[in-house]
Amino acid sequence: MTTQNRLRKRTFAIKAGLLGLTVVVLTSIKAGERYELGPYIVGATRTERDASTLGISADVLLGSEVDRKMYRDLRHVLFDIKGVYSQSDEALGSTAEVMIRGNSGSRVLTMVDGAKTNTSIFSNGRFITGASGFNLGRVEVVRGAQSTLYGSSAIGGVLLLETRQGRGTPRYTFTNELGSFNSFLTAFQGQGEAGELDFSFHAASQESDNELSDNEGKMKSYSFRLDYDLSENTTVGISSRGEFTDYSNPVGDLTPPPSTRVQSDTIAVSAYVKTSRENWTQKFTASMLDEYYRQTGFIYIGDAANWSLDWQNTVDVSDSLRLVAGSTWERQEGNDNSFPESESDNWALFAQAEIEAGKGVNLVLGARHDDYHIAGSKTTWRANGAWELPTKTKLRAAIGTAFRAPNFFRLFSTSSFALGNPNLKPEESKSWEVGFDQYYKNGAIQLGATVFQNDIEDLVVYVPTTGFDGTYANRDSAENYGLEAYVSYQLKENWSANLAYTWTESSAKDLSLNTTSRLPGVPRHQISLNNEFRFDEKWLVGLGVNYVIGRESFGSVDIDNYLLVRGYSRYRFSDAVSLTARVENALNEDYTVSFSSFSGRVPARGFAVFAGVEWRF
């Protein structure tokens, strides 16, 4: 072990010790009144759970907050969540890569209304990173190994997006926004109830020249959700989200014009039937995701689809025991211009027990078996627990395994530059975490920290052969460990704030050369601060700060740190009309999103200001 690695391991041990000391101090504080944590979390167990009972680290962001903060796409939403890094150049129409705990986008499972967006071609879940911020019900981030619940790719965690369920009297909002770089946005959305039918929808169109030459982007999106109560015990529903982008990508400052033209069309559809009989609830879900991608310049065309049938049973055996079990069938289809249409099926069985073992003690035990007809079988398991103390301190710990099946490109590509290997095996991972959460003043003030680690074996990597040719092999290993901490508070009714910090050490070991290097693009430190002030019932002002430190590109080349500041404001003239304004990259920070010796530096968008009007009826 090198001296540098020893120092990092020692730092990790010191921070873990400080975490334990903090818990001891906090648990000595006198208990106050009962606390309430607000929104439930579904993705951590596949059932509705209060955050105070969870033994793992998870966050939920409601659609109302996305609307209030004027996040126009998911890239901005994810930047404020601890343990998550959304790497993007901010240009309209471009995409981002979502990383959780140092794991790249292909090792983070993303889902929209139950449909997986990690496809056989685009394994990093391209759709959800640029997904529209309109008509969202909730965005959940569940960290750590989650293959026991969801199967392949859930190594670093799971990102779940849910379309809003209509509630109350029907109401509609028209949004129009103009801004820097000849940008405009038009959106119409609505939601409500009509008898036994709940409905919501949105349609939006955006265009921008963006900042660079030959860099224009266009994006259209839609969503809808319908839920209908057939009877007191049976509900059916259908939802869909679609994104259609057309983007001129300059690629990098070493790439000569013209820009590469990228067109991407993605549609996700899911439908469900849910029945309840006393203590037994069944939910049957069918989902489909279709994605088409076309790139000019270096011509690339990819077409992929995911199909899924999921049957989940939830049985409340007693007040202290809930069982969850079911089966999943999945089919992936895809092809690109290097290999013909291919498909793969997967059958899975899963089971989970949620146990209230004593006062304030909650345990979760689960297992799953996946059988891929191409990649083989894989069994995963997990266990986690939470202990709520009288001091309103929650201690928690979790351990589990996960895997990632190889995608079609790495299996079947016929290109000599990246020849597929049909003998690839799934990557395997094991992870653990320990942490605490502390609640004060009926949950108005919350703070906590988590120490985590996950190790990956049989890492699929590109292996050069001769000249510019190469293929793929299960050769290397990877390690991610670090610390997440947060403080959130509502000091007054008109002032709320959130502070989050993430430290991540992320490295891969080349087992053929016995060398270790930091994984590209992963920040060593992330700090985010969000403040929101409501001066009265009409005027809202918000300020967000994100500081990113310690990234490296391929070849261990340092990438510049950067500080992003955004502000937003809404003034409500009446129940029908509001004026909005937002500023992105307020300090006009000039920073590099990514760098390669081949294409050069990819700069991020600079200072941008937007103003708009909202009309409600």
Predicted segments with their positions:
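Gram-negative outer-membrane beta-barrel transporters
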Residues: D319, L323, E356-G358, L363, ...
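Conserved C-terminal beta-signal and adjacent last beta-strands/turns
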Residues: Y228-D229, L519-F617
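Extracytoplasmic beta-strand/coil segments of soluble accessory domains associated
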Residues: F79-A115
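N-terminal periplasmic "start-of-domain" segments of outer-membrane beta-barrel proteins
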Residues: E36-K69, E97
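Flexible loop and strand-edge segments within Gram-negative outer membrane beta-barrel domains
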Residues: S208-S221, D229, N233-N306
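Outer-membrane beta-barrel signature, preferentially recognizing the C-terminal barrel domain
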Residues: D253-S276, E388, K392-K394, A398-I456, ...
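Short acidic/polar hinge/loop motifs at secondary-structure boundaries
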Residues: E97, K116-R143
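Short strand-turn segments of transmembrane beta-barrel domains in outer membranes
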Residues: Q146, V158, E162-G192, A203, ...
